[in-house]
Amino acid sequence: MTTYCALTVRKLKPGTYDEWRKAWGTEEDIPEGAEAYIVRSLTDPNEIIAFGLIEGDMDEIKATMDEDKERTRQEAMAPYIESTGADGIYEVIERIGARTGATTT
């Protein structure tokens, strides 16, 4: 089964993390079987990376996505974003470490 990573790098406007986070969504917005992380730069507290991991068939994953809801979510976050860096869906090609104790490809 293929694992995918949705990842975005955002530079937030100063002091807007709480508002951005509220617009980003809740645990209930995460697809079943997925896990999401939000991390903050140690050198720039306004730079955050949000990423989520999900296993499955990409066509099936896309079929469960609500494009209108995602567009509304993006619009709600936009006022708090100064800039966006990397932003996309990536295929996990290696998993290394703690979960399995082994390297898999």
What does each of the following model-derived ranges do?
Residues M1-T3, T104-T105:
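Compositionally biased, disordered extreme N-termini, encompassing classical targeting presequences
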Residues G25-Y37, L53-G88:
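An amphipathic, aromatic/His-enriched active-site/gating alpha helix that lines ligand/cofactor pockets
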Residues V39-L42:
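Short beta-strand micro-motifs enriched in acidic
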Residues I89-T105:
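Short, low-order "capping/linker" segments at domain edges
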